[in-house]
Amino acid sequence: MSTPLRGSSPQVSFYESELDQEGGSDASHFTYRNYMEDDKINSFTFNMARKDQTQLFQRIILTNESESEIEEYAEVAEQLLDAINLREKYVFHPKIWKADAPVGEKPPYSPFESDESTNCATEHMFKEVNGVYFVYSNETDMKSNKALFSVPHTLASYYKDINNLMMLSSYGPAKTFTFKRLQLLESKFNMHTLLNDSLELFQQKTAPHRDFYNVRKVDTHVHHSSSMNQKHLLKFIKRKLKENPNEIVIFRDDKYLTLAEVFKSLNLDVDELSVDTLDVHADNNTFHRFDKFNLKYNPCGQSRLREIFLKTDNLIKGKYLAEISKEVFTDLESSKYQCAEYRLSIYGRKMSEWDTLASWIVDNDLFSTKVRWLIQVPRLYDVYRETSTTTFQDFLNNVFHPLFEVTKDPSSHPKLHLFLQQVVGIDCVDDESKFEKKFTEKFPVPGEWSSEHNPPYTYYLYYLYANLYTLNQFREEKGLNILTLRPHSGEAGEVDHMGAAFYLAHGINHGINLRKTPVLQYLYYLTQIGIAMSPLSNNSLFLTYNRNPFPAFFARGLNVSISTDDPLQFHYTKEPLMEEYSIATQVWRLSVCDICEIARNSVLQSGFEHNVKSHWLGPDYANSGGNDIKKTNISDIRVCFRNETLIEELHLILKSLQTLPNFKNLNINFLLDKLPSEITTGNDYKLKKAQLKLNGANKLRNSSVGSTPNNGTPSSSGTPSLSSPGAIVHLMKTKPYIPPPLSLNIKQENNNNNNNNNNNNNNNNNNNTNTNTNSNSTTTNQDDNSKSDK
């Protein structure tokens, strides 16, 4: 049906849908009213802006889906569900940390004061077994190997799961199914914006004192040593040369050098310094050359300047980096609505790195309500092997042993205990384009890995994940905050990097290689894994801006945000995050609602505390479809569209699974938790959900679930009416679309339903009567399309 929103005719026709509940949730039905008058359209538009009403807008609803296609892709749906269920078993599901804290912008802790309730030492013991740390209640339990916590999967089973996932990603029917669904998702979004952009903009204008500039946005992926822009660094260096030229800053060539002597030895004059001589900005020579890009961290091409100005562990104990960090914090706080999650490095060369880094944070009072920290672990075991780490286990010990030690007894590392209050996650970084040995379950355990070759990405990620898993359980038991795994993944290299991250990570950075594998991309969509993308960074290193998949990912509904990565190398302005947003908006023609949605995604992906997110996004931010337009400036229509589209995709998976003969033995817990109760209100699904919660059994009776026919009254057979042959897409102004409850053999049941109705209406039933009834039904559908839309 065409909907002439503009034109010479003053009349606009659309459908408004109301959901009435009669006889309980199992007897829900729809009634439609067709408005053709201008005055009623105005009142409808006014109602659209009311927060207390269900959102009404033009929806795209597909009808007459082919049952043969649903059956054809049932096997694919089962494999997709298996992958999702495996992720649910792998990934650590944290409890909401201090959820009872009052809603506010400040975190529920004092940054440099420890909580007495979590500051006491306990009798817990821990030890490393085959590369993974395990925690025990006491020494007796440790001797008898009675660990408190365990890791869900071993290295061997992990690699088998990765292999299966890679086989699924190259499976023909799976690629066809997921590619079609992703294309349909993108087309749906384009149609939605075409039909409803003016309504979304109208809703945004009704939000008082709110626009894109004053909604919270988090830079979820930025490296701290390059958090300032090149002009800022240049001014800071010049200022230090003028104010403190005689300060001793480095020990080189068996003598101590002052700042002025360092520049003199490099033949650099303060008056001749410029952005060009600083030479820290990425250029054409860095494209596909990560080695040359790493050299850009050296101001003027000199490693000693990097050590003086951009390192925390140096002769002056990171004094200059702390000072410039405070200036960056001041810029963030002056902007008020911009926040950042900075990466600090732990290399795994020695255990004292943690205490050194924590002392730098605490001694310099580096804290801001706008900043949280992540620890990045570079994959450089092969570099340090000859000096400090003889096996990969030494590397893991240097990274994790201090964390378990401070969790057991905070007084053993008091500054580290305070610093960890502000740390929200672990990152894994390095050049993904390097060649690496293919993964196999026959890899040696870390204690036996003494090879000169670096372990592959998947090996690193598993042992970071496994040790974080037991550490988080330990910290959660003691009432401490937990650390999530959010690695770099999919910037370059093989697609198995993103497969490993799908199972193990809470979110990823970059992810541009998802464009190469529709199966993984669809899985990331269904599970809504956060993806922090950096288009300007990719443009200088691996992928030109016009080829970046960000706009496609966003349109399809993936949980994507925009981040800066390295402002020192890629940006020019004092507000690099706003620079990213402005370029993306202009190049990809994003609307105000689009960029506000991206900003909201960045807050959801971030590690800021629950009470802080509630203050920024509203108390319902964690609920499905929850939105407070007064805080997010996102139209309720947009949030409703995203939520309904995801529900429809999950519902399609469930419908496909229902055609399988072993459906009653499948674990559909994930789908039952994500889908609204209106879809799973039938007795069969109530029974199955109850049994899943009680004993894990999956039982489903082979009977259809009650539904609603088009005439607004409950059907005697409990099946939906499909009396609209040929109809493919209907544009409707409706309340949220709720797919009908599932039923088996819909076509056959529908025919039986029509025959039963004919028998009830006419005792002298014959073939002519049936023909007339079908003809009348078709005529009725032509007169009132509202009866064929469901």
From Swiss-Prot:
Keywords: Cytoplasm, Developmental protein, Differentiation, Hydrolase, Metal-binding, Nucleotide metabolism, Sporulation, Zinc. Disruption phenotype: Cells grow normally until development occurs. Then they make a significantly increased proportion of prestalk cells, and develop fruiting bodies with short thick stalks and glassy sori with less than 5% normal spores. They have an increased content of pstA-type prestalk cells. Intracellular levels of inosine increase dramatically during development. This is cell autonomous, as the presence of equal numbers of wild-type cells does not alter the cell type proportion nor improve sporulation. Overexpression of the gene has no apparent effect on development. Zn(2+) binds at residues 221, 223, 488, 565. Residues 1-14 have a biased composition (Polar residues). Its cofactor is Zn(2+). Residues 1-26, 698-726, 739-790 are annotated as: Disordered. One of its GO terms (biological process) is AMP metabolic process. The active site is at 510 (proton acceptor). Pathway: Purine metabolism; IMP biosynthesis via salvage pathway; IMP from AMP: step 1/1. Substrate binds at residues 223, 292-297, 491, 566-569. Binds 1 zinc ion per subunit. NCBIfam families: AMP_deaminase. Homodimer. Belongs to the metallo-dependent hydrolases superfamily. Adenosine and AMP deaminases family. This is AMP deaminase. It comes from Dictyostelium discoideum (Social amoeba).
